[in-house]
Amino acid sequence: MPFAYIDTSSEAIKAFAGKYKAKTGQDPNSAAQYGYVGADIIVAALEAAGRDLTRAKFLAALEGIKDYKPLFPGPSLSYGPDKHQGSTATFLAKVEGGRWKVIAENLLY
């Protein structure tokens, strides 16, 4: 997922960044972005698994996530019994003016 610079991001990302900075005293970095997406997927799976949680229900819920759209830029993620990677797409970026700039998206591998 490309890095989302706060000053050029959506209002939802700006809200995330504000909450993150209020808690940590720092602006979010790429690890924070990946961590947010990972945690959000876990929460979605826990909610889908229901209150009578079992390992089997949790795994089935994780593997049932389809077309999850992360808060941050990047491809949608889908999982299944034989698909645990989420996406088979990547992107190509270069540094321009001291910032990462995406020059190609959804490159399949």
Where are these regions (language model features)?
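Extracytosolic ligand-binding ectodomains
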Residues: 1-109
